[in-house]
Design a protein with these regions (language model features):
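HotDog/MaoC-like acyl-thioester-processing domains
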Residues: 1-22, 104-190, 237-299, 372-419
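Hot-dog-fold acyl-thioester-processing enzymes
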Residues: 2-106, 176-177, 181-197, 280-360
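Short histidine-centered beta-strand/loop micro-motifs
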Residues: 48-51, 113, 135-138, 217-222, ...
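Short, glycine/small-residue-enriched coil/turn segments at secondary-structure junctions
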Residues: 57-63, 114-120, 197-207, 290-291, ...
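Short, structured beta-strand/loop micro-motifs enriched in basic residues and often containing a Trp
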Residues: 99-108, 234-243, 357-365
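Glycine-rich active-site loops that engage anionic ligands at enzyme catalytic sites
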Residues: 205-241, 333-340, 344, 348
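Short, solvent-exposed loop/turn elements at beta->coil junctions and helix N-caps
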Residues: 214, 365-371
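Hydrophobic, well-ordered secondary-structure segments
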Residues: 346-351, 355-363, 372-373, 401-408
C-alpha cells in the first residue's frame, strides 16, 4: 500500500462510526402513500388499503407494508441538503478516487411493530463500515454500510435497517452481455414461415402436459436454459411453444401455465408458455399448514420502463439511475434499473400473497446481484427453510430467489409470523 493509499484508507476509517442528527420524514405516513405503493407493486393485500377489513383483522386498522420502513425518510426529488452528513463525507472521499456511481445492493430489516397511517418517523443514521476496494460485475468499488434506527417523533422504536451500497468507478466496468434492446427472442422451433398462425390470446390458461430441454444451444444472451413444452389450454386446444422465464427446476408436468406474447426486435409476436401469477390467499396460513422444503409457486414479473419508474417514485427514490436512461448510461449502467426498495416491495408482496393478509413480516434480508433492466422478466420463487415456535404461533423462514436473463437479480430471506 502506497502512502497515498494509506492516507485514503485512513480518511475512510475516520468516518466509520460517525453518527448524524435524526432525519425527520417530510410527512407522516398516509393511506394515500400506502395506496400508491400498492398500485406500483400490484399488491392487493387488504391490510394496506381496505379500512373496513383491516379494522376487523388482527391489525385493528390499516398498516403499511413492512419493507417500506426506510422509504418514509427519503428526501424525495428536492432534497433539503444537510451539509456534512456522514454518508456525504464518505462519498466525497470515495469520489477523489473516481468512485462516483452508486447502487444499493443489500439490506437487512428488523421490525419492532407495524407502521400505521399517522406515524411520523425519524431516521438515526450512522456509518457502519466501509470495505476495502472490491472487484464487482459493475466495476471496482467500495461497499458502504449505513445503519439506521427508526423511531416515531415521540421516540418509540419501530425498526432498524442496515443498507449496503456500492460506490464504484464507472470507468472500471467491463463489457458484459448485450442490453435487452439487443436481445433476439428465440422463435418456436420448427417454424413454418409460410403458414398462417392463429396465436392464442395472451392470458390464456392451461396445464403443462410435457416439456423438454432441447440439445441445441440456448440463447447466448439469456442465462436461463432453453425449454420447450406442450400444454392443454382451457378451451381444450393443444399448444406447443417455448417455456419462458422459468429455470428448469421450476418446471414440471401438470403445473399451471399461461400464454404470454413476446415481441422480437423485428416486430414479430411469439407466443410462449410461462407460469401465471400465484393466486393471493384471502385467509392466513397457520404454522400447521407449512413444512420445511415447501415451495412457493413461481411468479414471473415483466420488467418495463414504466414499472421501474413507478416503483422508484412510489418508494420516494428519485435517484436518476432509476428514471433517466442518459444518467444511468453516464454512471456505467446499461439502462435504467430497478431500485432496491422496488425489488424488496415485490418480494414483500410475493411473501404476503402466499402467507395471507394477517401474516406479519418479522425481519427481512435481501441482496441484489444482476440489475433488472427494461425488457426483461424477473421470476420470483421461494422455499420454506425454517419453522420455529413463537408466542401464539410459528415463525416461518422463507428464502426467495429472483432471476432474470442475466442471472440472479435478488436473493432474499424473511421471517414471517403465522398463527
Amino acid at each position: 500500500m502506497t502512502g497515498s493509499d494509506a492516507d485514503f484508507r485512513a480518511r475512510l476509517d475516520a468516518l466509520i462510526g460517525l453518527t448524524d442528527p435524526p432525519r425527520r420524514a417530510k410527512d407522516a405516513i398516509t393511506e394515500a402513500a400506502i395506496r400508491i405503493w400498492c398500485d406500483a407493486v400490484g399488491d392487493e393485500n387488504p391490510a394496506y388499503q381496505d379500512p373496513r377489513w383491516a379494522a376487523g383483522s388482527v391489525w385493528g386498522g390499516i398498516v403499511a407494508p413492512a419493507t417500506s420502513l426506510n422509504m418514509w425518510t427519503l428526501p424525495g426529488n428536492r432534497r433539503a441538503h444537510r451539509h456534512a452528513e456522514s454518508l456525504d463525507r464518505v462519498n466525497e472521499v470515495l469520489a477523489t478516487r473516481g468512485f462516483t456511481s452508486v447502487a444499493a445492493v443489500q439490506t437487512e430489516h428488523t421490525y419492532v411493530r407495524p407502521l400505521r397511517p399517522g406515524d411520523h418517523l425519524e431516521q438515526f443514521p450512522s456509518i457502519g463500515a466501509v470495505s476495502p476496494e472490491k472487484s464487482t460485475r459493475l466495476g471496482r468499488g467500495h461497499f458502504v454500510d449505513l445503519v439506521s434506527d427508526y423511531r416515531t417523533v415521540e421516540g418509540e422504536p419501530v425498526g432498524r435497517v442496515v443498507l449496503r451500497m456500492l460506490r464504484w468507478n464507472p470507468a472500471t466496468r467491463t463489457e458484459g452481455p448485450a442490453t435487452s434492446g439487443d436481445r433476439l427472442a428465440r422463435p418456436v422451433r420448427p417454424v413454418a414461415a409460410a403458414a398462417p398462425i392463429d396465436l392464442p390470446p395472451a392470458g390464456t390458461t392451461g396445464t403443462l402436459t410435457a416439456h423438454l430441454q432441447p440439445g441445441y444451444a440456448a440463447d447466448p444472451l439469456d442465462e436461463r436454459p432453453y425449454l420447450v413444452g406442450s400444454a392443454e389450454l382451457a378451451d381444450g386446444t393443444r399448444f406447443s411453444a417455448d417455456v419462458a422465464y422459468l429455470r428448469p427446476d421450476l418446471v414440471h408436468d401438470g403445473m399451471p401455465v399461461v400464454v404470454a406474447h413476446r415481441r422480437t426486435r423485428d416486430g414479430q409476436i411469439l407466443p410462449v408458455l410461462t407460469a401465471p401469477r400465484p393466486q393471493r390467499r384471502t385467509s392466513t396460513r397457520t404454522g400447521a399448514e407449512v413444512s420445511i422444503g415447501q415451495r412457493l409457486a413461481p411468479w414471473p414479473i415483466p420488467v418495463t420502463q414504466l414499472s421501474i419508474a413507478a416503483l422508484a417514485t412510489a418508494t420516494f427514490d428519485f435517484n436518476d439511475v432509476h428514471l433517466d436512461r442518459d444518467a444511468a448510461l453516464e454512471r456505467g449502467a446499461r439502462d435504467v434499473y430497478m431500485n432496491i426498495l422496488g425489488s424488496s416491495a415485490l418480494v414483500n408482496c410475493y411473501l404476503t400473497d402466499w402467507a395471507g393478509p394477517e401474516a406479519r413480516v418479522v425481519d427481512f434480508r435481501t441482496r441484489l446481484a444482476a440489475q433488472n433492466h427494461p425488457g426483461d422478466t424477473c421470476t420470483l420463487d421461494g422455499v420454506v427453510t425454517g419453522l420455529n415456535p413463537a408466542d401464539g404461533g410459528t415463525h416461518v423462514t422463507v428464502d426467495v430467489r429472483g432471476t432474470n436473463s442475466l442471472g440472479d437479480h435478488v436473493i432474499a430471506s424473511a421471517t414471517i409470523a403465522l398463527p
